[in-house]
Amino acid sequence: MGSQVAEVRQTRNAERTRRAVLDAATAVILEKGSAVTLAQVASAAGVSKSGLIHHFGNRDQLVLAVVEDVYEQFRARVLEHLDLSENYPGKLLRAYVRALGAGSTEAVAVRDLTSAVSWNGLYTIPAVAALVDEQNAEWSKQFAADGLSAERIQVVRRAAEGVAAAAVIGDEDAESIATAVGLLLDLATDGTFRSPL
């Protein structure tokens, strides 16, 4: 019994350490961009560099884990914004727009991931580039099954991502984001705006 308790405790500690490293790595990457080092992440996470390597192996594996984590968090946020009472085409696309327009930490993280210049150098890592392509393809596939035309999906999706990118660099305030989200939700509903522009 004592060894089982110790094993559970050790697993929890490993999970906490992993979470701390992922959170710290995200913050350091946003600050340092592709020049991020394992030493910087280890310092920010409060772990030794050897401890970080134990969990992630090397820098590329850490970066890949960060990107995977941010995508998982964002997918969860999109699903939280899914309105099950909307029984008409575009339900998932509207949830995507709401999630990108939300102010949650996870939404901001994915806006940073998908939009911030500081991440661009990370896409040179083959596994990261493949994951980004895979995620884009998966979103496209799910949106295509959502009942709207491909053209409408493209316009709404890319506009929402653009608004999110502008928010990251400070070009949009909360009011303008809310206005844009409202217009995009209208466009993802029946293709028309409720009020004149």
Annotated model-derived regions:
Residues 115-122:
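Generic transmembrane alpha-helix motif of multi-pass integral membrane proteins
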Residues 1-16, 195-197:
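N-terminal intrinsically disordered/low-complexity leader segments
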Residues 105-108, 126-197:
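Hydrophobic/aromatic-rich alpha-helical bundle segments in the mid-to-C-terminal region
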Residues 14, 67, 71, 129-136:
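Amphipathic, non-transmembrane alpha-helical scaffold segments
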Residues 76-114, 181:
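Hydrophobic alpha-helical connector segments
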Residues 24-31, 77-80, 159-166:
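Solvent-exposed, amphipathic alpha-helical segments
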Residues 63-70, 77:
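Alpha-helical DNA-contacting segments of helix-turn-helix folds
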Residues 20, 24, 28-61, 65:
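Helix-turn-helix
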